[in-house]
Amino acid sequence: MGIKHLYQVISENAPDAVKTGEIKNHFGRKVAIDASMSIYSFLIAVRSDGQQLMSDAGETTSHLMGMFYRTLRIVDNGIKPLYVFDGAPPKLKGGELAKRSARKREAHEAHEEAKETGTAEDMEKFSRRTVRVTREHNEECKKLLKLMGVPYIDAPTEAEAQCAVLARAGKVYAAASEDMDTLCFEAPILLRHLTFSEQRKEPIQEIHLDKALEGLGMDRKQFIDLCILLGCDYLEPIPKVGPNTALKLIREHGSLEKVVEAIESDPKKKYVIPDDWPYKEARELFFNPDVRKADDPQCDFKWESPDVEGLIQFLVTEKGFSEDRVRNGAARLAKNLKSAQQSRLEGFFKPVTKTEAEKASLKRKHDEKIEEQKKRKKEEAKAKKEAKARPRGAV
């Protein structure tokens, strides 16, 4: 799930933190990818007539189809992917996982009912909601990656947190995930939409944590407190607290402790904090997640030549894939993983350090830009209010 509305908050209040561009712009870069999130998206997206793809034996193959062809697209564009798999979820995440499981059970029942009485649209909608990534899906994807020569590692707990460790250490350029909570784990750069299909034509979003903090005017602790208030995987959100209110509360009070104190002492009881809301434990999980250090031997990885015959046996013989397509894919892998060895030009040059005067000038321009955006929003809100107050038919 990640952090609710965080992308909206960053793009509106720290626009300089977000860059969008084509996948080819990341040629020559190593990227750590949240595997479990990717597999989940493959199970939802890679379908035929609203149903997951199946082998002749009735086994789901959507995850393998997605992993094979989306990884090929990444490698075709000169990127060297490293996949990171989730380990056991933190205990605090249990409540959220239980809720998701209950929602999936309800969706499964609704899906069965839609089969009997509903439209094809209803069936597809409820079918997507029943999707969950199983241990078997993960193990089959690991087997496929090994045959492709693409490395993967297992995280002790959260894959996003391990991706962030590797990015901070410079072992990869960025962490790639659709989950915005990757930024809470201090990933310097987050890439989104990297494993999307080419048909979706979604640009790659590149979000820089330092610029997000600068634009929001927050330190990392305040940023994490904001994310907890927005709603994260560890805690349910406070009812009636949306993105604008969450941002206002953190800016006004500076920390979750003071926000909670203000809410509980409010005689009007405008907001009510859930009975079981251990925000300090959630904050600790973001600050000190269970991860392996970047220099741990289990975090070593390298790209190798694909095992062509192994791929044929697994994908073609066992799973019913097209042999021509698999052989073609293996050839592309072998060729493009070699070309991805070429360094980006930026690797040969050290960035020139800005003077204090230049930094002050950039900050002034940034502040002016933020003020201009706020002014424009106020004017737009005022215009909307006036338009609503105007009688119908009045000019």
From Swiss-Prot:
Cofactor detail note: Binds 2 magnesium ions per subunit. They probably participate in the reaction catalyzed by the enzyme. May bind an additional third magnesium ion after substrate binding.
GO terms for biological process, alphabetical: base-excision repair; DNA replication, removal of RNA primer
Region (N-domain): 1-104
Binding, DNA: 47, 70, 158, 231, 233
Stretches the record annotates as Interaction with PCNA: 341-349
Enzyme class: hydrolase
GO cellular component assignments: mitochondrion; nucleolus; nucleoplasm
Location in the cell: Nucleus, Nucleolus; Nucleus, Nucleoplasm; Mitochondrion
A GO molecular-function descriptor: 5'-3' exonuclease activity
Residues given in the record as Mg(2+) 2 binding sites: 179, 181, 233
Keywords: DNA damage, DNA repair, DNA replication, Endonuclease, Exonuclease, Hydrolase, Magnesium, Metal-binding, Mitochondrion, Nuclease, Nucleus, Phosphoprotein
Main localisation: nucleus
Record EC number: 3.1.-.-
Cofactor(s) essential for the protein: Mg(2+)
InterPro entries from the UniProt entry: 5-3_exonuclease_C_sf, Flap_endonuc, HhH2, PIN-like_dom_sf, XPG-I_dom, XPG/Rad2, XPG_CS, XPG_DNA_repair_N
Residues that, per the record, bind Mg(2+) 1: 34, 86, 158, 160
UniProt PTM comment: Phosphorylated. Phosphorylation upon DNA damage induces relocalization to the nuclear plasma.
Compositionally biased spans, kind Basic and acidic residues: 356-389
Segments for region (I-domain): 122-253
CDD domains linked to this entry: H3TH_FEN1-Euk, PIN_FEN1
Function: Structure-specific nuclease with 5'-flap endonuclease and 5'-3' exonuclease activities involved in DNA replication and repair. During DNA replication, cleaves the 5'-overhanging flap structure that is generated by displacement synthesis when DNA polymerase encounters the 5'-end of a downstream Okazaki fragment. It enters the flap from the 5'-end and then tracks to cleave the flap base, leaving a nick for ligation. Also involved in the long patch base excision repair (LP-BER) pathway, by cleaving within the apurinic/apyrimidinic (AP) site-terminated flap.
Similarity field: Belongs to the XPG/RAD2 endonuclease family. FEN1 subfamily.
Assembly and oligomerization: Interacts with PCNA. Three molecules of fen1 bind to one PCNA trimer with each molecule binding to one PCNA monomer. PCNA stimulates the nuclease activity without altering cleavage specificity.
Protein name, entry field: Flap endonuclease 1
Organism per entry: Talaromyces stipitatus (strain ATCC 10500 / CBS 375.48 / QM 6759 / NRRL 1006) (Penicillium stipitatum)
